[in-house]
């Protein structure tokens, strides 16, 4: 069922209130529905995009200049899934080394996540050498609003309320009593047994920080809310050629044939040996004719005979030529953080300030990863790559496109000194307040976050169900 505003609701009928309708919020609501648990699903925006609604997402970035915060996320039904790229894959097992739970704890939710995303449950890998794997992503075309809108409208267990902004929570004695919301400029209270904050990788921190100011003493002052914020620098790392015939021969029967870009990722052995972070590169599936002509031209200038050989292979379609794109992990850094600014939106809630700077650790990761991959290409004669000078020189990344992977800020952990939520996504020392989404990530790996967000949301719904029936 849909409501355009928060009005005439008997909150006693809904033991769970979920705020946010992106992948985290909708997934949790759908899982609770399967267990016959009624929930309120509350969205700040409307059913469709509007510039007026997006203006509430303004914010200031201090440090590395990334995309404006109002343009790399969506305040509407379905959340930022309306503009996500669709690339889906579990995080590497080693990416969970610093988490209070492990990859195996999420494995049981993988098939459900794939069903939600309408993708195959297939994430193959093939070993190139001791340092690199060829890896496989799945591509989802799911937009959560489009896929689930009618289902939610017809649901007896999910009541969706639009145009209702969550301001903050009120609680005492380690228990959340109600949420303060603003619907059609009218302040309302939302009561429930359990509250789930699923408003995204920036808003989750913003709302908890505002709660701490509005209801002092409720949320522990020591919780590092907003800190350890991360993203995935997406960069143009260079250009390259890969001899597909030789690559297939090297991998024997283990070459991964699939539609989409050719992906290579670091193994844990490379990360440990070079003391770097995780990263992955990809080349587009279709050769970029402009790029490979430029590559051949440059090779002919310095190595004419090899250049002629390359030219022949291009025309035989034995080579994959083009730009090399890269996703690099960022190390958690408490100085990369979200705070509340002095400027407020029209409903009186402070906009955020994001302090963000890419670390030298990430710059070093890109350089050493590419150098080692280049060495592999030469040693096994499967191709050649040319690394951008800026990466060789450890210059600041030039980020491509919008910075949409917002992670950290409400990180998961075992104690309140370096984390905000526990392994079940419950806020430390508060009995009935949960946070869902990539803001809970302890580390980000190189993988797009949506798949892991969905796994964690399914797990969260399971934990709430257990508590409701205990």
Positions of the model-derived regions?
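N-terminal Rossmann-like FAD-binding beta1-loop-alpha1 element of flavoenzymes
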Residues: 14-41
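Conserved redox-cofactor binding core of oxidoreductases
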Residues: 66, 101-176, 397-402, 411
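FAD cofactor-binding and catalytic pocket of flavoenzymes
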Residues: 59, 222-228, 232-350, 403-406, ...
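Residue-level detector of alpha-helix initiation sites
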Residues: 22-23, 202, 360, 440
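Glycine-rich loop(s) and the adjacent beta-strand/alpha-helix scaffold that form part
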Residues: 34, 169, 180-252, 437, ...
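Redox-cofactor-proximal catalytic regions of oxidoreductases
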Residues: 54, 58-123, 334-338, 346
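Extreme N-terminal leader/targeting segments of oxidoreductases
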Residues: 1-16, 34-35, 466-469
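A glycine-rich dinucleotide-binding beta-alpha-beta segment and adjacent secondary-structure elements
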Residues: 161-172, 319-328, 350-357, 361-443, ...
